[in-house]
Amino acid sequence: MTTGNGQSQQPISNLEYDFITVLHNKAEAVKAYDCYIKDAQEINSQPCVELFQKLRQSEIEQAQEVRHHLQQVM
């Protein structure tokens, strides 16, 4: 719903909410990968450690991109 001046009466736009939700999910994924890396280290599986580190880094990079877009729409 919008007011007469075209502004939404919602505290944040749907797009802002979407970006915040994605950013939260990326942060949770990074935290999960930390656990997965630890598990792989405990059984001395270097290939698994490296894979989880690569996936974790990808999540971080995606989170940074999402954050940039969120700043643009706020």
Predicted features and spans:
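Iron-associated oxidoreductase/ferritin-like identity signal
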Residues: 1-74
